[in-house]
Regions:
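A structural motif
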Residues: 27-28, 183, 254
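Active-site beta-strand termini and strand-to-loop segments that position acidic
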Residues: 106, 296-299
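A structural alpha-helix within SAM-dependent methyltransferase catalytic domains
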Residues: 23, 151, 176-179, 246, ...
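Conserved SAM/SAH cofactor-binding pocket of Class I
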Residues: 137, 141-219
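S-adenosylmethionine
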Residues: 191-295
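SAM-dependent Rossmann-like transferase core, predominantly class I methyltransferases
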Residues: 90-159
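N-terminal auxiliary segments of SAM/dcSAM-dependent transferases
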Residues: 3-121
Length: 300
């Protein structure tokens, strides 16, 4: 089977809307590139950019979504985008991200691609927790700012013995980190079957019991999410999805939230939503190149 690989550079301010558009369109897969090693950086070029890069993958027969993507970009970005595309085989599709994916440390964790585990695990420094991750077709390599922000904070939360909910788990990287930090029970859910498969694979590759880390297909309305009590809810999801589900988020039985996936331009709007609908207050904020981490607590 062949796929259409579309390589895009778009303004960062429309990235949130673009990912929401891709989710609603049900594209085969996509990911955002943080560091593009194919493009040399000039010595005086800033790392922080007003643009962001995506790779989008469409099944060969999915010509409709390619047209929709072009229309979306023309309407929302005008002429301020760059697009190129090529045909690739299934093996290339599944292997494409490996070129950009090497072991690296974030806070208390070292993220290690599963294909490099034999060497990387043995060289992980003492006190650093190794996370073996193969994202497959799901979001969550750890390179993206939103994932880095959450991982950087998780090591400070004292998760031992806690019950953790991870909504929009993607590759399962955050759930794996929670389990390896001592959480007693984690429920990881995603509406994308690719995410469910990837998270399950990564759970098993890290030798985490299914009794500790349960992976299911679903969203905020998944019954166990609303029925059970949680010590922490993690949601690394775009602002549009968080906004659409704010009432369901408010009804989750937890007092502690960790949100990422919100761009700086939407931060105040999201905080206003949390204040009015969820209740409570922000206890920790951190920004990384235009993306926001928001830790939120409400009284028990």
């Amino acid at each position: 089977m062949r796929y259409r690989e579309i390589i895009l550079t778009i303004p960062k301010e429309i990235a949130d809307d673009f990912t929401n558009f891709l989710d609603e369109a049900g594209v085969a897969g996509y990911y955002e590139i943080l560091f593009d090693r194919e493009v040399p950086r000039a010595p005086d070029e800033e790392i922080i950019s007003d643009d962001t890069k995506f790779r989008v993958y469409l099944a060969e027969e999915d010509k409709e979504n390619e047209t929709k993507i072009l229309i979306f970009l023309k309407v929302n970005a005008g002429e301020n985008f760059f697009l190129e595309s090529r045909w690739i085989e299934t093996k290339e599709y599944e292997e494409a991200y490996k070129e950009f994916y090497k072991p690296f440390v974030i806070g208390s964790y070292r993220v290690i691609p599963t294909w490099e585990k034999d060497i990387a695990v043995s060289t992980t420094p003492p006190g650093i927790i190794p996370l073996l991750i193969n994202p497959g077709l799901a979001f969550g390599t750890g390179h993206h700012e939103t994932t880095r922000l959450v991982l950087g904070r998780m090591g400070n939360l004292g998760l031992s013995g806690k019950r953790v909910l991870d909504v929009g788990t993607g590759s399962g990287i955050l759930s794996v980190a929670a389990a390896k930090s001592g959480a007693s029970h984690i429920l990881a859910v995603d509406i994308d079957p690719n995410g469910v498969r990837s998270a399950t694979f990564n759970r098993d590759d890290n030798e985490i019991s299914p009794e500790i880390l349960k992976v299911e297909e679903g969203g905020f309305d998944f019954e166990p999410i609303q029925k059970e009590e949680w010590d922490l809810l993690i949601a690394n999801i775009t602002f549009a999805v968080l906004k659409a589900n704010i009432q369901k988020i408010a009804s989750v039985k937890t007092h502690h939230f960790l949100f990422s996936g919100v761009i700086t331009e939407r931060k105040e709007e999201f905080i206003k939503l949390l204040t009015e609908v969820v209740g409570g207050e922000g206890v920790f904020f951190q920004e990384d190149t235009g993306w926001e981490l928001i830790e939120w607590k409400r009284k028990g």
